[in-house]
Amino acid sequence: MNLHNEELWQKYLGEVIRVSDLNELQTVKVKFLGKKGEVTLALKNLKNLPPELRPEAGHKINTVKKLIEEDLEKREQELLQKALEEKLSKEAIDVTLPGYSLKLGKLHPLTQVQHRIVEIFTSMGFSVATGPEIEKDYYNFEALNLPKDHPARDMQDSFYITEEVLLRTHTSPVQVRVMEKYAPNLPIRIISPGKVYRRDDDATHSPMFAQCEGLAVDKNIRFSDLKGVLLTFIKELFGPKTKMRLRPSYFPFTEPSAEVDISCVICGGIGCKVCKGSGWLEILGSGMVHPRVLEMAGYDSSVVTGFAFGMGLERIAMLLYGIDDLRLFYDNDIRFLQMF
Protein backbone atom coordinates (compact mmCIF):
# COMPACT_ATOMS: atom_id res chain seq x y z
CA MET A 1 0.00 0.00 0.00
CA ASN A 2 1.29 3.47 -0.94
CA LEU A 3 0.85 5.43 2.32
CA HIS A 4 1.91 8.71 0.72
CA ASN A 5 -1.26 8.72 -1.36
CA GLU A 6 -3.47 8.54 1.69
CA GLU A 7 -5.62 11.65 1.95
CA LEU A 8 -5.17 11.96 5.70
CA TRP A 9 -1.38 11.78 5.52
CA GLN A 10 -1.22 14.34 2.74
CA LYS A 11 -3.49 16.68 4.65
CA TYR A 12 -1.20 16.42 7.69
CA LEU A 13 1.88 17.13 5.60
CA GLY A 14 0.21 20.19 4.13
CA GLU A 15 -0.38 21.55 7.65
CA VAL A 16 2.90 20.63 9.33
CA ILE A 17 5.09 22.00 6.56
CA ARG A 18 4.15 25.55 7.61
CA VAL A 19 5.06 25.03 11.30
CA SER A 20 7.88 27.29 12.57
CA ASP A 21 7.73 26.96 16.37
CA LEU A 22 6.60 24.65 19.15
CA ASN A 23 3.27 26.40 19.66
CA GLU A 24 2.29 25.91 16.02
CA LEU A 25 3.42 22.29 16.20
CA GLN A 26 1.20 21.74 19.22
CA THR A 27 -1.75 23.19 17.28
CA VAL A 28 -1.19 20.70 14.44
CA LYS A 29 -0.86 17.86 16.94
CA VAL A 30 -4.18 18.71 18.54
CA LYS A 31 -5.82 19.11 15.11
CA PHE A 32 -4.87 15.57 14.05
CA LEU A 33 -4.37 13.59 17.30
CA GLY A 34 -6.56 15.44 19.81
CA LYS A 35 -9.91 14.15 21.11
CA LYS A 36 -11.67 15.85 18.21
CA GLY A 37 -8.75 15.54 15.80
CA GLU A 38 -8.76 14.21 12.23
CA VAL A 39 -7.27 10.81 13.11
CA THR A 40 -9.51 10.36 16.14
CA LEU A 41 -12.63 11.09 14.08
CA ALA A 42 -11.47 8.69 11.35
CA LEU A 43 -11.15 5.92 13.94
CA LYS A 44 -14.58 6.71 15.34
CA ASN A 45 -16.11 6.56 11.84
CA LEU A 46 -14.94 2.97 11.37
CA LYS A 47 -18.24 1.86 12.86
CA ASN A 48 -19.99 3.16 9.79
CA LEU A 49 -18.10 0.74 7.51
CA PRO A 50 -19.19 -2.80 6.75
CA PRO A 51 -17.69 -5.22 9.27
CA GLU A 52 -15.48 -6.95 6.71
CA LEU A 53 -13.79 -3.63 5.75
CA ARG A 54 -13.16 -2.35 9.26
CA PRO A 55 -9.90 -4.25 10.00
CA GLU A 56 -8.11 -3.09 6.88
CA ALA A 57 -9.37 0.49 7.21
CA GLY A 58 -8.41 0.56 10.89
CA HIS A 59 -4.95 -0.74 10.06
CA LYS A 60 -4.47 2.04 7.47
CA ILE A 61 -5.62 4.74 9.89
CA ASN A 62 -3.37 3.46 12.71
CA THR A 63 -0.45 3.33 10.28
CA VAL A 64 -1.04 6.98 9.39
CA LYS A 65 -1.45 7.81 13.09
CA LYS A 66 1.91 6.21 13.89
CA LEU A 67 3.59 8.08 11.04
CA ILE A 68 2.13 11.37 12.30
CA GLU A 69 3.28 10.67 15.89
CA GLU A 70 6.82 9.83 14.75
CA ASP A 71 6.98 12.87 12.50
CA LEU A 72 5.69 15.14 15.29
CA GLU A 73 8.30 13.77 17.70
CA LYS A 74 11.07 14.34 15.17
CA ARG A 75 9.93 17.89 14.38
CA GLU A 76 9.56 18.68 18.11
CA GLN A 77 13.18 17.70 18.77
CA GLU A 78 14.33 19.79 15.81
CA LEU A 79 12.41 22.84 17.04
CA LEU A 80 13.73 22.37 20.60
CA GLN A 81 17.29 22.25 19.30
CA LYS A 82 16.66 25.32 17.17
CA ALA A 83 15.21 27.23 20.15
CA LEU A 84 18.21 26.24 22.31
CA GLU A 85 20.68 27.41 19.68
CA GLU A 86 18.86 30.74 19.33
CA LYS A 87 18.88 31.21 23.11
CA LEU A 88 22.57 30.40 23.39
CA SER A 89 23.32 32.75 20.52
CA LYS A 90 21.51 35.62 22.25
CA GLU A 91 23.17 34.88 25.61
CA ALA A 92 26.65 34.34 24.22
CA ILE A 93 29.45 36.06 26.13
CA ASP A 94 32.26 37.72 24.30
CA VAL A 95 35.21 36.74 26.46
CA THR A 96 37.36 39.37 24.76
CA LEU A 97 35.28 42.20 26.27
CA PRO A 98 36.59 43.78 29.50
CA GLY A 99 34.81 42.50 32.61
CA TYR A 100 33.29 44.42 35.50
CA SER A 101 35.85 45.05 38.21
CA LEU A 102 34.93 44.06 41.75
CA LYS A 103 35.27 46.45 44.65
CA LEU A 104 38.12 45.13 46.75
CA GLY A 105 38.29 45.57 50.49
CA LYS A 106 41.27 47.01 52.32
CA LEU A 107 43.15 46.15 55.45
CA HIS A 108 42.09 48.17 58.49
CA PRO A 109 44.56 51.01 59.20
CA LEU A 110 45.53 49.39 62.51
CA THR A 111 46.20 46.12 60.71
CA GLN A 112 48.34 47.96 58.17
CA VAL A 113 50.36 49.55 60.99
CA GLN A 114 50.75 46.21 62.75
CA HIS A 115 51.99 44.55 59.57
CA ARG A 116 54.54 47.33 59.05
CA ILE A 117 55.81 47.07 62.64
CA VAL A 118 56.08 43.28 62.37
CA GLU A 119 57.94 43.67 59.07
CA ILE A 120 60.51 46.01 60.64
CA PHE A 121 61.22 43.86 63.68
CA THR A 122 61.33 40.55 61.80
CA SER A 123 63.94 42.13 59.53
CA MET A 124 66.03 42.58 62.70
CA GLY A 125 65.74 38.92 63.67
CA PHE A 126 62.66 39.01 65.90
CA SER A 127 59.89 36.42 65.56
CA VAL A 128 56.18 36.85 66.30
CA ALA A 129 54.67 35.22 69.40
CA THR A 130 51.03 35.17 70.48
CA GLY A 131 49.13 34.23 73.61
CA PRO A 132 45.62 34.06 75.11
CA GLU A 133 43.57 37.23 75.51
CA ILE A 134 41.79 35.66 78.51
CA GLU A 135 44.73 35.41 80.86
CA LYS A 136 45.59 34.17 84.33
CA ASP A 137 46.26 36.80 86.97
CA TYR A 138 49.65 35.18 87.55
CA TYR A 139 50.93 35.83 84.01
CA ASN A 140 49.32 39.24 83.73
CA PHE A 141 50.66 40.57 87.04
CA GLU A 142 52.59 38.32 89.44
CA ALA A 143 55.10 36.90 86.95
CA LEU A 144 55.79 40.49 85.87
CA ASN A 145 56.84 41.58 89.37
CA LEU A 146 53.36 42.76 90.31
CA PRO A 147 52.29 40.69 93.34
CA LYS A 148 48.74 40.99 94.67
CA ASP A 149 49.72 43.64 97.23
CA HIS A 150 51.84 45.69 94.81
CA PRO A 151 50.66 49.33 94.69
CA ALA A 152 51.36 49.53 90.95
CA ARG A 153 48.31 47.34 90.32
CA ASP A 154 46.22 50.45 90.93
CA MET A 155 47.68 51.88 87.72
CA GLN A 156 45.41 49.63 85.65
CA ASP A 157 41.69 49.02 85.98
CA SER A 158 41.12 45.54 84.67
CA PHE A 159 38.22 43.43 83.38
CA TYR A 160 38.18 40.46 85.78
CA ILE A 161 36.23 37.31 84.88
CA THR A 162 37.04 35.52 88.15
CA GLU A 163 39.47 36.38 90.93
CA GLU A 164 42.26 34.60 89.05
CA VAL A 165 41.23 35.18 85.42
CA LEU A 166 40.93 38.45 83.50
CA LEU A 167 41.15 40.01 80.07
CA ARG A 168 44.84 40.75 79.67
CA THR A 169 45.79 44.39 80.20
CA HIS A 170 48.93 44.15 78.05
CA THR A 171 50.70 41.60 75.86
CA SER A 172 53.53 41.21 78.37
CA PRO A 173 52.14 37.82 79.55
CA VAL A 174 53.21 36.46 76.16
CA GLN A 175 56.82 37.33 77.04
CA VAL A 176 56.58 35.40 80.31
CA ARG A 177 55.05 32.37 78.62
CA VAL A 178 57.78 32.36 75.95
CA MET A 179 60.55 32.62 78.56
CA GLU A 180 59.01 29.79 80.62
CA LYS A 181 58.77 27.64 77.50
CA TYR A 182 62.37 28.10 76.36
CA ALA A 183 64.27 28.60 79.65
CA PRO A 184 67.18 28.13 80.09
CA ASN A 185 67.78 28.21 76.31
CA LEU A 186 69.02 31.37 74.64
CA PRO A 187 68.62 33.67 72.81
CA ILE A 188 65.02 34.94 72.73
CA ARG A 189 63.94 37.70 70.37
CA ILE A 190 60.18 38.09 69.99
CA ILE A 191 57.47 40.66 69.41
CA SER A 192 53.91 40.05 70.58
CA PRO A 193 51.20 42.09 68.82
CA GLY A 194 47.60 41.67 69.95
CA LYS A 195 44.46 43.05 71.58
CA VAL A 196 44.41 44.15 75.22
CA TYR A 197 41.66 45.43 77.51
CA ARG A 198 41.38 48.14 80.17
CA ARG A 199 38.57 50.12 81.76
CA ASP A 200 39.14 53.36 79.88
CA ASP A 201 37.22 55.19 77.16
CA ASP A 202 37.87 58.69 75.82
CA ALA A 203 39.37 60.45 72.79
CA THR A 204 42.80 58.94 73.45
CA HIS A 205 41.84 55.68 75.20
CA SER A 206 39.66 52.69 74.34
CA PRO A 207 38.47 49.75 76.49
CA MET A 208 39.91 47.47 73.81
CA PHE A 209 43.03 48.44 71.93
CA ALA A 210 46.06 46.91 70.23
CA GLN A 211 49.60 46.66 71.53
CA CYS A 212 52.89 45.38 70.25
CA GLU A 213 55.55 44.46 72.77
CA GLY A 214 59.06 43.18 72.25
CA LEU A 215 61.52 41.09 74.25
CA ALA A 216 65.16 40.11 73.84
CA VAL A 217 66.91 37.81 76.32
CA ASP A 218 70.52 36.64 76.09
CA LYS A 219 73.89 36.93 77.78
CA ASN A 220 75.47 40.38 77.88
CA ILE A 221 72.46 42.33 76.58
CA ARG A 222 72.89 45.99 77.48
CA PHE A 223 70.77 49.12 77.51
CA SER A 224 72.66 50.30 74.45
CA ASP A 225 71.27 47.28 72.56
CA LEU A 226 67.76 48.40 73.43
CA LYS A 227 68.54 51.92 72.27
CA GLY A 228 69.96 50.67 68.97
CA VAL A 229 66.96 48.44 68.22
CA LEU A 230 64.45 51.20 69.01
CA LEU A 231 66.35 53.83 67.03
CA THR A 232 66.42 51.52 63.99
CA PHE A 233 62.69 50.85 64.37
CA ILE A 234 61.82 54.54 64.70
CA LYS A 235 63.82 55.62 61.67
CA GLU A 236 62.31 52.83 59.57
CA LEU A 237 58.75 53.69 60.61
CA PHE A 238 58.79 57.49 60.85
CA GLY A 239 61.64 58.36 58.51
CA PRO A 240 65.46 58.63 58.68
CA LYS A 241 65.41 62.21 59.99
CA THR A 242 63.37 61.29 63.08
CA LYS A 243 65.20 61.80 66.38
CA MET A 244 64.76 59.73 69.53
CA ARG A 245 64.88 60.72 73.19
CA LEU A 246 64.88 58.49 76.27
CA ARG A 247 63.42 59.71 79.56
CA PRO A 248 63.77 57.88 82.90
CA SER A 249 60.52 56.25 83.97
CA TYR A 250 59.11 53.45 86.12
CA PHE A 251 57.65 50.09 85.16
CA PRO A 252 57.48 47.22 87.68
CA PHE A 253 58.78 44.67 85.16
CA THR A 254 61.83 46.63 83.93
CA GLU A 255 64.78 48.23 85.71
CA PRO A 256 66.01 50.70 84.61
CA SER A 257 62.98 51.90 82.64
CA ALA A 258 62.58 54.63 80.05
CA GLU A 259 59.86 56.40 78.10
CA VAL A 260 60.75 56.81 74.43
CA ASP A 261 59.97 60.07 72.62
CA ILE A 262 60.43 60.98 68.97
CA SER A 263 60.80 64.36 67.36
CA CYS A 264 57.33 65.61 66.41
CA VAL A 265 56.26 64.15 63.07
CA ILE A 266 54.05 67.20 62.46
CA CYS A 267 56.43 70.09 63.06
CA GLY A 268 59.75 68.27 62.84
CA GLY A 269 60.64 69.20 66.43
CA ILE A 270 60.05 72.95 66.15
CA GLY A 271 56.96 72.92 68.36
CA CYS A 272 53.23 72.81 67.54
CA LYS A 273 49.81 72.07 69.05
CA VAL A 274 50.23 68.32 68.59
CA CYS A 275 53.45 68.16 70.62
CA LYS A 276 52.23 71.01 72.87
CA GLY A 277 55.20 73.13 71.87
CA SER A 278 57.78 70.66 73.18
CA GLY A 279 58.88 69.29 69.82
CA TRP A 280 58.63 65.73 71.16
CA LEU A 281 55.98 62.98 71.12
CA GLU A 282 55.87 59.99 73.45
CA ILE A 283 55.42 56.69 71.58
CA LEU A 284 56.40 53.77 73.83
CA GLY A 285 57.81 52.48 77.11
CA SER A 286 60.91 50.34 77.51
CA GLY A 287 63.60 49.09 79.84
CA MET A 288 65.86 46.26 80.92
CA VAL A 289 63.94 43.17 82.07
CA HIS A 290 63.73 43.15 85.87
CA PRO A 291 65.96 40.41 87.39
CA ARG A 292 62.99 39.08 89.37
CA VAL A 293 61.00 38.57 86.15
CA LEU A 294 63.91 36.61 84.66
CA GLU A 295 64.24 34.48 87.79
CA MET A 296 60.51 33.64 87.90
CA ALA A 297 60.67 32.57 84.25
CA GLY A 298 63.58 30.19 84.92
CA TYR A 299 66.70 32.21 84.02
CA ASP A 300 69.76 33.02 86.12
CA SER A 301 69.67 36.82 86.32
CA SER A 302 73.35 36.93 87.27
CA VAL A 303 74.22 35.58 83.82
CA VAL A 304 71.25 36.47 81.61
CA THR A 305 69.89 39.94 80.86
CA GLY A 306 67.28 41.27 78.50
CA PHE A 307 65.32 44.27 77.35
CA ALA A 308 61.62 44.82 76.69
CA PHE A 309 59.46 47.50 75.12
CA GLY A 310 55.80 48.08 74.38
CA MET A 311 53.68 50.45 72.31
CA GLY A 312 50.02 51.07 71.53
CA LEU A 313 49.27 50.58 67.84
CA GLU A 314 46.53 53.20 67.92
CA ARG A 315 49.02 55.75 69.22
CA ILE A 316 51.44 54.92 66.41
CA ALA A 317 48.67 55.05 63.79
CA MET A 318 47.40 58.40 65.10
CA LEU A 319 50.88 59.87 64.69
CA LEU A 320 51.45 58.34 61.26
CA TYR A 321 48.08 59.43 59.86
CA GLY A 322 47.47 62.65 61.81
CA ILE A 323 44.34 61.37 63.61
CA ASP A 324 43.28 63.13 66.82
CA ASP A 325 40.53 60.77 68.08
CA LEU A 326 41.35 57.13 68.75
CA ARG A 327 37.67 56.12 68.67
CA LEU A 328 37.56 56.69 64.91
CA PHE A 329 39.40 53.40 64.45
CA TYR A 330 36.45 51.50 65.95
CA ASP A 331 33.43 53.45 64.65
CA ASN A 332 33.17 51.37 61.46
CA ASP A 333 32.69 54.53 59.41
CA ILE A 334 33.36 53.47 55.83
CA ARG A 335 34.18 57.06 54.85
CA PHE A 336 37.01 57.10 57.39
CA LEU A 337 38.30 53.62 56.56
CA GLN A 338 38.39 54.33 52.81
CA MET A 339 41.01 57.01 53.44
CA PHE A 340 43.69 54.38 54.07
UniProtKB/Swiss-Prot annotation:
Disulfide bonds: none annotated. Binds 2 magnesium ions per tetramer. The keyword Glycoprotein does not apply. It catalyses: tRNA(Phe) + L-phenylalanine + ATP = L-phenylalanyl-tRNA(Phe) + AMP + diphosphate + H(+). Mg(2+) binds at residue 255. One of its GO terms (biological process) is phenylalanyl-tRNA aminoacylation. InterPro entries: aa-tRNA-synth_II (IPR006195), aa-tRNA-synth_II/BPL/LPL (IPR045864), Phe-tRNA-synth_IIc_asu (IPR004529), Phe-tRNA_ligase_II_N (IPR004188), Phe_tRNA_ligase_alpha1_bac (IPR022911), Phenylalanyl-tRNA_Synthase (IPR002319), tRNA-bd_arm (IPR010978). It comes from the Bacteria. The keyword Nucleotide-binding applies. Its cofactor is Mg(2+). Keywords: Aminoacyl-tRNA synthetase, ATP-binding, Cytoplasm, Ligase, Magnesium, Metal-binding, Nucleotide-binding, Protein biosynthesis. One of its GO terms (cellular component) is cytoplasm. GO terms for molecular function: ATP binding; catalytic activity, acting on a protein; magnesium ion binding; phenylalanine-tRNA ligase activity; transferase activity; tRNA binding. Its EC number is 6.1.1.20. It is found in: Cytoplasm. Tetramer of two alpha and two beta subunits. Belongs to the class-II aminoacyl-tRNA synthetase family. Phe-tRNA synthetase alpha subunit type 1 subfamily. This is Phenylalanine--tRNA ligase alpha subunit. The gene is pheS.
